[in-house]
Regions:
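A charged, aromatic-enriched C-terminal amphipathic alpha-helix characteristic of glycosyltransferases
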Residues: 15, 337, 354-380
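A conserved mid-protein helix/loop that constitutes part of the nucleotide-sugar donor-binding site
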Residues: 17-22, 219-242, 256-262
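Donor nucleotide-sugar binding/catalytic pocket of nucleotide-sugar-dependent glycosyltransferases
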Residues: 56, 139-142, 162-206
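Aromatic "clamp/platform" in nucleotide-sugar-dependent glycosyltransferases that forms part
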Residues: 279, 298
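Conserved acidic donor-binding segment of nucleotide-sugar-dependent glycosyltransferases
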Residues: 330-343, 350-355
């Protein structure tokens, strides 16, 4: 039986972390022996749906610090590299982090057997172990690259993280961004493949039936995302106010922008219609009961929430942002895309709310079925 290992920094509530869990489940459903390892504990971790997925915790930072070299490199990075270069802490952490991970993997394989495929999800994960190299490993890039400023620093980082590695982009938009980065920062991956995120239709549709008394009984607009600048909630609030719709707007998620968004809702005189629902361990009932799901991000590597909302039978509207949203909203769904501006998004909301809730077609989700994604990872 083929054995797989998905590696993620933590199992906190977040899109990338949820995808890591979904991928581990997809490997299990495909008949593989599936393992999932995380580096940092959180109070309420995400869990795989299938009990057959074996979850492991490697306290990477603590073990790194137990080695004299690892502790010294962390101190050096904190006191020297980070102040000089900015965001360079991983250069120190990842040297011994990779050694610690390789040692853990060796012991893991002594107990469970040789791993056939290792999948690292997210740059934040493989930053912590960047010195680790293995031909069985695939490194998944979840988002597009940004090219403003500090090109020499970014070139150094890119050579540490991406050079001569087998990379996987979650969308063609991310892959195109990587190719531009290759030219600017002078690195060359061993390979680059596009594999979309899995959408576990069956488990989503089971989870969406869960009762939740906090969900409004009346129709509402919905956004599910961390409240951070990249998700563009300021644009969403302004467009929502401009649309003049009487339906409430529900924001599921939390983050650093919450206070400023509450203040903006008050400034726009829509505070009585905007519901800040906070983090929800199960967002799918909220998606199921929504009249319209609205995405307002500045960029999205894939936009997993779009096909999660579609899986729940809810119509979607998205701004046309850099990344992978066009790979979800294609064909008949292209009408769900609008220009990323306050006026266009407001007009899109108004148009989308006209008439009955539209039917969602099953074939729109075919590219993201877990069995296809699992097979794509082990085939390369």
């Amino acid at each position: 039986m083929m054995r797989t290992l998905v590696v993620v920094r933590s199992l906190k509530m977040g899109g990338m972390e949820r995808v890591a869990v979904n991928l581990a489940d997809a490997f299990h459903e495909a008949g593989y022996e599936s393992h999932l390892v995380h580096f940092r504990k959180v109070k309420r971790p995400l869990r795989p749906e299938h009990s057959g997925v074996k979850v492991h915790h490697l306290p990477l930072q603590q073990r790194n610090r137990l080695t004299l070299v690892g502790y010294g490199l962390e101190v050096l990075a904190r006191l020297l590299l980070n102040p000089l270069m900015g965001r360079a802490l991983f250069l120190g952490l990842g040297v011994m982090g990779g050694v610690v991970f390789r040692h853990w993997l060796k012991r893991f394989e002594q107990e469970h057997g040789r791993v056939d495929r290792i999948v690292f999800r997210g740059i934040g994960t493989f930053e912590l172990v960047w010195s680790f190299r293995d031909r069985r490993a695939r490194y998944v890039l979840e988002n597009i690259f940004h090219f403003n400023g500090a090109s020499r620093r970014k070139a150094l980082f890119a050579r540490c993280l991406y050079h001569r590695r087998d990379l996987v982009a979650v969308s063609q938009g991310v892959a195109d961004s990587l190719r531009k980065a290759q030219t600017l920062w002078k690195f060359r991956p061993r390979s680059l493949t596009v594999i979309p995120n899995p959408c576990p239709l069956r488990s989503i549709r089971e989870a969406m039936l869960e009762a939740n008394d906090a969900i409004p009984s009346e129709p509402y607009l919905l956004n599910v995302a961390r409240l951070v600048p990249a998700k563009g909630h300021d644009l969403l609030l302004r467009a929502y106010a401009r649309s003049g719709t009487s339906l409430p707007l529900v924001l599921v998620g939390d983050g650093q922008e919450r206070d400023s968004l509450v203040a903006l809702a008050n400034e726009l005189d829509i505070a009585d219609k905007v519901i800040f629902a906070g983090n929800q361990y199960n967002p799918y009932p909220w998606m199921r009961h929504a009249r319209l799901f609205v995405l307002s991000s500045r960029f999205e590597g894939m936009g997993i929430v779009l096909f999660e909302a579609l899986a729940c039978g809810t119509a979607v509207l998205s701004v046309d942002c850099p990344g992978g949203v066009r790979e979800i909203l294609k064909g008949e769904l292209e009408t769900s895309l609008v220009e990323r501006s306050e006026e266009a998004l407001a007009d899109g909301i108004t148009a989308a709310l006209e008439g009955p809730k539209p039917e969602v077609r099953e074939q729109w989700l075919d590219d993201f079925r877990p069995e296809r994604v699992a097979q794509a990872f082990v085939a390369r």
